[in-house]
Amino acid sequence: MAGASMNDIKARIKSVQSTMQITKAMELVATSKLRRAKEKAESCRPFYEVLKGAIDDVFSSCELRDSAFSKKGEGGRTLYVVIAGDRGLAGGYNANIFRLVANLAREKEGVILPIGKKALEYYKHRNAEIFSDAFPSVAEVGVGDCLAIAEEICNSFKAGNFEQVVLVYTKFVSMISQVPVYEDLLPLVSNHEGEPLEFMPLIESDPEELLEAIVPEFLGGILWSSVCESLASESGARRSAMNAANKNAGEIIDTLMLKYNRARQAVITQEITEIVSGAEVL
């Protein structure tokens, strides 16, 4: 009986060790990807800040306050641009994004533009209204794709299909911290509103034509920066999850080894007892 128990424990130890080899390999891969994704995300942040500052300066002109991009659409619905991951095994990375979208959508009816395999699968499975399913892999989204998405969003917003457009993604804070956030993309709101500017921007062309040209570029830049942040966050979350899995596996192996040694000691004790008993009979 004890022998069978020992064999079961040995089999469980081997199983956990095999799983641990996989999670260690995944942690190494995630660490490698995280390093590159982190550099890309950090390099995009100055670009993001410049874009935000430029659009604020341009939009601070009173001539642009009545633009189609500054008014809420008449559709009464919100377009949620949701950036999630392409794979699982990343802790609560994807679940946290979906929870944030669900909280936002409680207040307003929403249409989803999913970016990433998990986002597309999640919302299709729940029969959500999908704006576009053209971006099933966030890892394959490039700058050109972000500009194309932005152009499509701007055209739909100007047509009055949506009251507002909200971007939901995960901001990379550190190797161990990633925060799901949301940002209103449209309608445009100037951060300078109510504040006097040191100078008013000089706009030589037609204001509406200017916005027609720069808003899609602006939104495309914001989307690209958010994609980079999300990729770094996914790799960071996966690395943390695999690291935790490795620690748990190590603890399980230690516990099983303790059980195995106790069972082995019990078998040896029993054998010694039987030998001693046999010797006494003789």
Where do the model's predicted regions map?
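C-terminal beta-strand-loop-alpha-helix "lid" module of Rossmann-like NAD(P)-dependent dehydrogenases
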Residues: 1-282
